[in-house]
A protein has these predicted regions:
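Short, Lys/Arg-enriched N-terminal segments with co-localized hydrophobic residues
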Residues: 1-5
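Sec-dependent N-terminal signal peptides
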Residues: 8-19
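Conserved positions within compact, well-structured domain cores
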Residues: 23-192
Length: 192
């Protein structure tokens, strides 16, 4: 009887530890500039915003200039606007920080599975395993494109007047590219 009770207790402990490790560590941050509440998540050892920034600045827009798209997808920012958009205590991630983020996800899930693991469960048919909740907010170049199909994020790293963007798009890749600084992408802020 004693051993059966110990076995049951040990099973509960193992289950609790497994759940604690598997579930993302989440929180909420309130942006004092406009009162907007953002979900946060710890990935690796870093705290990220778990949704796209929706703070209005010059050189930021809603997809198709529709306010309801800002509410659903966050704002799209030029590179210069993105560099200034994060609240105090947060920053636009550098390429190295995005690379470490990508490596953490791919080392945990594999390159192909990372695509599904990052995508939103309810807005993009993914598993959102890490609570990062990537949504297909599209982008703006000369026109608005990719809504419902792709996600694009700025890094703070620039080169020769252009800047690095990180792109999650079909067929299932999360890749970095150097892009015109006038493009408009989503912003995810990283806690300092």
């Amino acid at each position: 009887m004693y051993f059966r009770g110990m076995k049951l207790a040990l099973s509960f402990i193992v289950l609790f530890v497994a759940l604690a490790v598997a579930l993302p560590q989440t929180g909420v941050f309130v942006d004092n500039r406009d009162g907007h509440k953002y979900r946060t998540v710890v990935i690796g050892s870093k705290t990220w915003m778990a949704e796209n920034l929706d703070y209005k600045t010059d050189e930021s827009e809603c997809y198709d200039d529709k306010a309801e798209n800002c509410k659903k997808y966050g704002r799209l920012y030029t590179f210069e606007a993105a560099r200034k958009a994060c609240p105090v205590g947060w920053h636009l991630p550098e390429n190295d920080e995005w690379s470490r983020f990508k490596n953490f996800i791919e080392n945990s899930d594999g390159k192909e599975a990372a695509w599904v693991s990052l995508k939103s469960r309810d807005k993009w048919d993914g598993s959102d395993r890490y609570g990062f909740d990537v949504i297909p907010a599209g982008r703006a170049t000369d026109e608005f494109v990719g809504l419902g199909e792709s996600a694009h994020f700025w890094s703070s790293t620039d080169e020769d007047g252009d800047a690095y963007g990180w792109h999650l798009m079909p067929p299932g890749d999360f890749a970095r590219d150097i892009d015109p600084a006038t493009n408009m992408y989503s912003v995810r802020c990283l806690r300092n």
